[in-house]
Amino acid sequence: MPHSWDYDAVVIGSGPGGEGAAMGLVKQGARVAVIERYHNVGGGCTHWGTIPSKALRHAVSRIIEFNQNPLYSDHSRLLRSSFADILNHADNVINQQTRMRQGFYERNHCEILQGNAHFIDEHTLALECHDGTVETLTAEKFVIACGSRPYHPSDVDFSHPRIYDSDSILSLHHEPRHVIIYGAGVIGCEYASIFRGMDVKVDLINTRDRLLAFLDQEMSDSLSYHFWNSGVVIRHNEEYEKIEGCDDGVIMHLKSGKKLKADCLLYANGRTGNTDSLALENIGLETDSRGQLKVNSMYQTALPHVYAVGDVIGYPSLASAAYDQGRIAAQALVKGEATAHLIEDIPTGIYTIPEISSVGKTEQQLTAMKVPYEVGRAQFKHLARAQIVGMNVGTLKILFHRETKEILGIHCFGERAAEIIHIGQAIMEQKGGGNTIEYFVNTTFNYPTMAEAYRVAALNGLNRLF
């Protein structure tokens, strides 16, 4: 006799991964509930991660653009804005995103339950509601999409009003003149751009020997140079010994013997999965030291009826990939298998000022693989559209096979890089000989556009062949 469950599936978390899973499930006729511990849907991506930080970056980049534009150089004063003013812009975007995503669930008759969930047994959850009551609910299957949070080492006092992580920095309540950013990963570099763009002194502490080592080295070097040129002080191969919070700021003692003092500290070195409150031990699931779950190609955990997607499974930890992971997991959950899969070359967008975006292999990878590749480059300063809008800083680089002309990687540094990259990505994904750098020579681009960089880079690369 079939078991009677409250739901066919329960999704824990309403970020990109949870949303992708929930929408995929209801579209296939499943009875679905989504549990969200926050008071609004959207998860960390919407409320204290991707959306607010990118809204901040956009506002700051527009201020920089105004102050550097020769059209306004006759003005006697620079345009400035407080951190609080810029946060208001981010709040407006967050509210729009929340209303839109709430509408998705309502239109698709997907139930939203608010509170904190943990497992009682393999098919039962306890839901601690915000009013203090506790409910139990059962489901045949589950999708864990509870995201991640900033890593907090035990010897750093995050309760101090001058010490922030990448979540709490969005509630910055004073106007710093000098900030220390510990951790030069994607989040650290993005906030270094934001603060420097607001004319705040920035010390960027990097525990490694170069910035964003997973990038093509030219892109990493371009960012390093741009930071240096704008006044960001980068300190490589450094680790903290002790962090002291005081009334007027923060003192950081480095293991190298150096001491730094600033108005505040942003600790942005690592993240951990939000799995510690799920009581996974009650169902026999274990996480790694970062609170992350291991899954197979269909996003099943060690328990076949429990799936996991998004930051909680680690790499690539991208909102874009998390949504697709949720969609694939939903297909596998209902049909027993998934015909869809993540693409091999997932694009990376880093929202520094200027942006960086990459897809495919780097020069270092191709050299190590002994692939006979060639390089085509286009400098933004040579493009009419870039000259018109004053976006002269930047480059597009295409890596392609010398013999087959197949595009192997595309790397872009400059404003709108995360948009520009998708043109090349679309060609890279073509099958049956469609992936060729010659496409960019044989097609017609609108003029003037930034997309024209592909034609310039393609000609540059093909001219190197002999």
Swiss-Prot record:
Cofactor note: Binds 1 FAD per subunit.
Enzyme class: oxidoreductase
Principal localisation: cytoplasm
Keyword Cytoplasm: yes
Cofactor(s) this protein requires: FAD
Keyword Transmembrane: no
Compartment(s): Cytoplasm
Protein name according to UniProt: Soluble pyridine nucleotide transhydrogenase
Gene source species: Salmonella paratyphi C (strain RKS4594)
Gene behind this protein: sthA
